[in-house]
A protein has these predicted regions:
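ABC-type nucleotide-binding domain
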Residues: 1-205
Length: 205
C-alpha cells in the first residue's frame, strides 16, 4: 500500500515495465483496479466524477503531445478561461522549466509556431525542448496536484538540475507525484517509492 499526503513530493522509481506509468493511469482512472481500492480524502476514487477528478491534476505523460500552434497557445491551452492570463505567465512557466533559451532563439517569440505547418515559418524543437514546452503547459495550469511521468527523460543533465530545483521551489506546499528511472531526479522528492513488478518493493525518504 502507499499513502500520499497533501504537500508530499513522491518519486516512484523502477525499471521499465515495473508499473510506474500504471500508477498514474490508475490515479486518473484510465482504468480501475481489479483488487484493493484507491482512496482520495477517504473516498473511493470510483465515486468521483472522472472529469472532475482529472481537473484536479496537472499532468505530463511520457508520451506528451505538443500542438501545431504558437508557443503562446501551446502553454495557454490549459488556462483558456483565465481572462487575466498574460504573456508574462507564459514567460514565467518557461523560466521555471529552464526554457528561457527556447524563447530567445524563436524568430517571432511567443508568436512562433511550434512545428512547421503549411506556409508558416515555424520552429522544430528538439526532443528536450518539446518536453520542456509540455512541462511549461503543466506548470501554467497551477493545480494543487502535479503528476509527471518521466519528466526529464529527454533533457540533458545540466538543464535537468536547473529544472528540478526550480520545480522544487515553485511547487512548495503542493503535491507532486513523479516517476523516473534516473536517480538524479530523487532530490526533488521527500519520499521515494521503489516499484518492482507492480508492487511496492521499498519506501523511504
Amino acid at each position: 500500500s502507499l499513502e500520499i499526503k497533501q504537500g508530499d513530493r513522491i518519486c516512484i522509481l523502477g525499471v521499465n515495465g515495473s508499473g510506474k506509468s500504471t500508477v498514474i493511469k490508475l490515479l486518473l482512472r484510465f482504468y480501475d483496479v481489479d483488487e484493493g481500492e484507491i482512496l482520495i480524502n477517504s473516498k473511493n476514487i470510483k465515486e468521483y466524477d472522472v472529469c472532475n477528478l482529472r481537473s484536479v491534476f496537472s499532468v505530463v505523460f511520457q508520451d506528451y503531445i505538443n500542438y501545431s500552434f504558437t508557443l503562446r497557445d501551446n502553454i495557454k491551452i490549459t488556462d483558456l478561461e483565465n481572462a487575466e492570463w498574460t504573456d508574462e505567465d507564459a514567460i514565467k512557466a518557461l523560466h521555471i522549466v529552464d526554457a528561457d533559451n527556447i524563447l530567445k532563439k524563436l524568430p517571432e517569440g511567443l508568436d512562433t509556431y511550434i512545428q512547421k505547418i503549411f506556409d508558416r515559418n515555424g520552429y522544430e524543437p528538439s526532443g528536450g525542448e518539446q518536453q520542456k514546452i509540455a512541462l511549461a503547459r503543466a506548470v501554467n495550469r497551477r493545480c494543487k496536484v502535479m503528476i509527471l511521468d518521466e519528466p526529464t527523460a529527454a533533457i540533458d543533465p545540466e538543464s535537468e538540475c536547473n529544472l528540478l530545483n526550480n520545480l522544487k521551489h515553485e511547487l512548495y506546499g503542493k503535491t507532486l507525484i513523479f516517476t523516473s528511472h534516473r536517480l538524479s531526479a530523487v532530490h526533488l522528492a521527500d519520499k521515494i517509492v521503489l516499484l518492482e513488478n507492480g508492487q511496492v518493493k521499498e519506501e523511504g525518504s
